[in-house]
């Protein structure tokens, strides 16, 4: 990856995720990125990393890699650091724990509205929500 401004010490956070919709196998790759969240019922798990952003001098070559399984009926939420300040995301954990819906767009909208109310939009906000429905076989 070539980074613009590398000679001046520019850097960027990278937050990638792959998810197999059939098995739920999910892998997070994080370079200095904000936490992600896994929700199933009233339980919420925070997925974090310790690596520095990409492009910093002396940064290790590999991102933090976390492998998990997204359960059927579970949601995966990825945010940028403009949504919730690092270390101040308890409100988001509580919001996710109390969410009982299945519509990813509605959940993203709710997170954004609460972030605007709390954080006053001091940075850009990016929110992605993935919902893994129960298998059709179990629904019949």
Model-derived regions: residue spans:
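Extracellular and analogous surface-interaction loops
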Residues: 18-21, 68-72
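A broad, structure-centric signal for solvent-exposed, well-ordered loop/edge residues
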Residues: 21, 26, 45, 54-56, ...
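Active-site-proximal, acidic helix/loop segment immediately C-terminal to a metal-coordinating Asp/Glu
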Residues: 45, 52, 70, 74-122, ...
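Intrinsically disordered or compositionally simple regulatory linkers and C-terminal tails
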Residues: 133-140
């Amino acid at each position: 990856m070539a980074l613009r401004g590398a000679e001046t010490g520019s850097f960027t956070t990278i937050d990638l995720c792959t998810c197999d919709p059939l098995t739920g196998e999910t892998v997070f790759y994080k370079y200095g990125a904000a936490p992600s969240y896994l929700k199933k019922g009233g339980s919420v798990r925070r997925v974090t990393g310790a690596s520095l952003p990409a492009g910093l001098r002396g940064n290790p070559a590999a991102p933090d890699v976390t492998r998990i399984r997204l359960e059927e009926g579970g949601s995966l939420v990825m945010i940028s650091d403009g949504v919730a300040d690092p270390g101040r995301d308890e409100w988001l954990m509580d919001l996710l724990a109390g969410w009982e819906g299945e519509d990813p767009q509605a959940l993203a909208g709710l997170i954004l509205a609460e972030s605007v109310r709390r954080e006053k939009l001091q940075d850009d906000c990016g929110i992605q929500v993935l919902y893994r429905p129960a298998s059709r076989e179990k629904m019949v």
